[in-house]
Amino acid sequence: MDDDARRAWSRTVAYFRSLDEHATHRHHFRHTDEDGNHWYFEAVPDRDELVVIKQAEITGSGRLLRYSWQHLEDAHGFLTDQPIDPAEDPVETVTAEEFGRVWAG
């Protein structure tokens, strides 16, 4: 990774960390895709959008994948960079407790 890429990575981590640490209201959603994977999202408002700050996926085989500012990506996936729009996206609202149980594994 060159210096420009490192700086960009650092800015991305700082952005998501700041959103997570300073959030006053959190929204939680889930989605099941056509492959049977279950996706859970924690999102916070930023600039009139709901930005995902934590994302968990339970794969069809039962594997739990988690992404946040502390772990943005790996060989299996990455924290989405797309905002959530509950009116447009195929997600349903879940409680903070449900999201927390999934996140904790």
For each feature predicted by the language model, list its residue ranges.
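Short helix/strand-capping turn motifs
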Residues: H28-Q70
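N-terminal functional modules and adjacent low-complexity/disordered segments of proteins
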Residues: S10-A14, T24, T59, Y67, ...
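Negatively charged, low-complexity tracts enriched in Asp/Glu with abundant Ser/Thr
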Residues: D2-Y40
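Generic secondary-structure transition motif, activating predominantly at the C-termini of alpha-helices
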Residues: R17-D20, P45, P83, W103
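Short, compact, well-ordered microdomains
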Residues: D74-G105
